[in-house]
C-alpha cells in the first residue's frame, strides 16, 4: 500500500472514492487492531496515509516529526514517509475551517460548545480558537479535564451555547438514530456542525435545520481534508482546486432521491426511469409493504387503519 487510510473500522468510509477522484493514484482502506498499529508504522511500507478513529493520537509516539500545528492540536490525521522518516500533519483543521467558511458559520465572538473529547475534538478546539471564539467548552459523558463539562451541565447552561460542534460518533452509520445533544434545547444557537458524513445528514443536523439553525454534516470537511492530504502526499497545491467539484460529485452519488405523491401519480414509472438513468437501485416502499404483509395496502387500511399503516411504513422506509 502506497497511499491509504488506517483505522479500526472503515466499512463506512468514503475516503477511497474521494482520493481516487482527486487523482490517478490507488488509495486503500486498511483496518488495524490496536495491537497491530505499532508494527504497521515501524515497517514504513507506505508513502502517505490518513489516520482515523481511534488512532489520531496513538500514532504520535511512532513519528519522527510532527508538524507544529499538529503538535499544538495534539492529533495527527496524515502521515508521510519522507526518506524513511515519518512526518505527521493535521489536515482536519483545514477541512473543518473550510466547511465553516463554506457554510458561512462564523465562530468569532461566539460561545462554542464541542461535543466529545476525542482526537477530532482537539481539532475543533483549535479551529474555534483560531476563529476567535469568545468561549470554548468541551462536553463529555465523563468530564475530567480543564474546560470540560457534563451533558447535564450543558443543558443547565441552555442559554449559553451559540455554536455546537459534534465530534462524537453518535448518529454515525450503522447506528444512525439519536444525537449527542438536542439543538432545540438551546435558544441562542446560531450554527451547528457535525463531523459525521455517513449519513449525509444526521438527526443532529436535521433537527437544527428544522428549527432554522444553519447546520452542516461533515462531507465537505472530509473532501477538503482529503485534498489537503493529497497536496502533502504529492507536494502539489492544485489538488485544493478540485474540492468543490469532488464534493458535488460525491454528494450526487450518495444522496437518495425520494419520490412522494398521491397514488397512481406516476412515482413508480418515474422512479424506474431515474434508476436506469443514474444507475441507482430502485426501491418501492408500497411493494415492500405489500410483500411483507402479504396483502394489498387498501386491505390493510380497512382492517388496521391509517395509524398502523404509517407506523409500518416508517419501519420499512428506515430499512430502505
Give the residues covered by each predicted segment.
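ATP-dependent small-molecule kinase phosphotransfer cores
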Residues: 287-320
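Phosphate/diphosphate ligand-binding glycine-rich loop within oxidoreductases
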Residues: 2-103, 199-201, 207, 211-214, ...
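Glycine-rich adenosine-cofactor-binding loop
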Residues: 7, 90-93, 100, 109-129, ...
Amino acid at each position: 500500500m502506497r497511499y491509504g487510510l488506517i483505522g479500526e473500522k472503515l466499512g463506512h468510509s468514503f475516503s477511497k472514492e474521494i482520493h481516487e477522484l482527486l487523482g490517478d493514484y490507488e488509495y486503500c482502506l486498511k483496518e488495524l487492531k490496536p495491537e497491530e498499529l505499532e508494527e504497521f508504522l515501524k515497517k514504513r511500507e507506505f508513502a502517505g496515509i490518513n489516520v482515523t478513529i481511534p488512532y489520531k493520537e496513538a500514532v504520535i509516539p511512532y513519528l519522527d516529526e510532527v508538524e507544529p500545528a499538529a503538535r499544538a492540536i495534539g492529533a495527527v490525521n496524515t502521515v508521510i514517509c519522507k526518506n524513511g522518516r515519518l512526518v505527521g500533519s493535521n489536515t482536519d483543521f483545514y477541512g473543518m475551517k473550510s466547511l465553516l467558511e463554506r457554510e458561512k458559520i462564523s465562530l468569532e465572538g461566539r460561545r462554542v460548545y464541542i461535543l466529545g473529547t476525542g482526537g477530532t475534538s482537539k481539532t475543533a478546539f483549535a479551529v474555534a480558537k483560531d476563529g476567535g471564539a469568545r468561549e470554548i467548552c468541551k462536553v463529555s459523558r465523563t468530564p475530567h479535564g480543564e474546560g470540560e463539562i457534563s451533558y447535564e451541565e450543558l443543558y443547565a447552561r441552555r442559554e449559553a451555547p451559540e455554536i455546537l460542534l459534534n465530534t462524537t460518533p453518535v448518529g454515525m452509520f450503522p447506528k444512525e438514530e439519536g444525537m449527542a445533544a438536542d439543538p432545540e434545547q438551546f435558544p441562542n444557537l446560531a450554527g451547528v456542525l457535525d463531523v459525521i458524513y455517513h449519513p449525509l445528514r444526521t438527526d443532529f443536523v436535521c433537527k437544527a435545520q428544522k428549527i432554522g439553525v444553519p447546520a452542516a454534516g461533515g462531507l465537505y470537511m472530509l473532501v477538503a481534508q482529503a485534498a489537503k492530504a493529497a497536496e502533502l502526499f504529492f507536494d502539489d497545491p492544485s489538488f485544493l482546486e478540485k474540492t468543490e467539484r469532488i464534493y458535488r460529485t460525491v454528494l450526487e452519488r450518495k444522496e437518495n432521491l425520494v419520490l412522494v405523491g398521491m397514488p397512481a401519480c406516476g412515482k413508480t414509472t418515474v422512479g424506474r426511469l431515474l434508476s436506469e438513468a443514474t444507475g441507482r437501485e430502485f426501491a418501492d416502499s408500497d411493494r415492500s409493504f405489500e410483500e411483507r404483509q402479504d396483502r394489498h395496502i387498501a386491505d390493510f387500511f380497512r382492517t388496521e387503519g391509517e395509524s398502523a399503516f404509517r407506523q409500518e411504513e416508517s419501519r420499512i422506509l428506515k430499512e430502505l
